[in-house]
């Protein structure tokens, strides 16, 4: 019998994957000194809305993935790590949102640069923390005997590579793009969860 939770979670993961490239592009535009203050604020607000929507959809899908592992396969090995990622990403989105809007309101100049730097440091630290935990999650998932129709391992690999990109900081945009593939694989796992029965060898 089809579980609507997994179907909804799949579409949320797809939504997050679709919004992520647009958010990345708008974030670059918002960081560029183009146009007047109102234009900068408009771009920043648009990036904020799309970025927040992508993050919310992605986090809900991640919560459902944890539920899928818990309920269908009795696996709880990444529960605490997923909780950490959810909390940290929520804080990161909030800090980035406040910083982006404040910088846009200030406009172009030394004050804007100083303000941006004040927000960049915590954002980088939070990104590194998320990257490290993503690597650990990926490694744990790679150790599972059951591959959930050959999708766990690709998801784990994307998690490790994207996490490494965030840890390296300079490759963070690449890591963000890899989240698109990660969410697509996650969506496929949700869709296929309704097509198969739990497998007892999942440990």
PLM features: what roles do these ranges have?
Residues 37-40, 44, 116, 120, ...:
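Membrane-helix interfacial "entry" motifs
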Residues 93-107:
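Membrane-anchoring/interfacial helices and their immediately flanking loops
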